[in-house]
Every structure is written in structure tokens, then in C-alpha cells.
Amino acid sequence: MKDMYLTPHFSLEEFTRSSTASAKGIDNSLNPSRADHRQVIENIKNLCEQGLEPLRQHFGQPVVISSGYRCPTLNRAVGGAKTSQHMTGEAADIRVPDNATGMKWFAWMMEHLEFDQLIKERATKASPTFWIHVSLNANGRQRQHVICNLIKNQTS
């Protein structure tokens, strides 16, 4: 399914690719012919259409997915939350090209998108760079919950 595009700029493969899954031998693929995977794929498509594609089109810059869909095994392997929206295809982490651009993206997303969560996240307090986590509830009820500086690993 590497060539299955969900929107003009986002493919399903971008959301299932994971270096952790590859290193640990975890199958993180989604198959559209499987009934249990179809809703997850629809959720990812909705995230692209309502969140990522508008961002891409507004700024005219590539939006790189650093973490998209995670099967439960992969989610445990990366230390994800037990209720992570990554497991349902409702969330993505996006890599920002640099902090200044990332801040512009974050501000634009807060102002122009309907979202469930929008988080400016970094690995440790000392990390100079950050990524953006964005999620949309498939049920359409978006909380517009914003966290501006989540530290992933408080012990570092």
C-alpha cells in the first residue's frame, strides 16, 4: 500500500512508516481490505484533509510525519499513552523544519484549524527543537485543547 495517496500530498505509507517498528520487527501496516483497518484509514484521511493538507497548502512547504498510525504493540514500544489517538489514526506528530517555521505553523493551526489536541512537544527540557502533535476526533467533537510546551521525558 506504499502508493495509496489519501490526499494530494499525503500517502498511507507516511503514516505507517516507523523506524522503531522496523528495528523491533513490529508489523505496523494497514490493509484497506481488512474491515478493522478501514476505519483507521478513514480517520487518517480525515486528519489529512482537515488538518495537514490545509497546513501544507497554506505555507507551501512539505509537512513531514514523524509519527502517525501506531498499532498497539508499537504504541507500547514507544511509550505512548494507553489511550493514544495514534492507535486510531486520529493523531500525527509532524517534524518542523526549524523553530521559527514551527512557531508559525503552530500559531496558524491554533487560529485556523478545528482540532482535538494541538501540542508543541519536545523530548527533554534541554532539547532545542520541538515537533507538533495534532489530533482530530473521528466523532467530530473537537476540544481545541492546546498545550504549548509539553516535555516528553521529564527525567532528562
Language-model segments: what does each one mean?
Residues 83, 88, 96-156:
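Catalytic cores and adjacent binding grooves of peptidoglycan-active enzymes
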Residues 49-79:
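Extended, low-complexity, intrinsically disordered C-terminal regulatory tails
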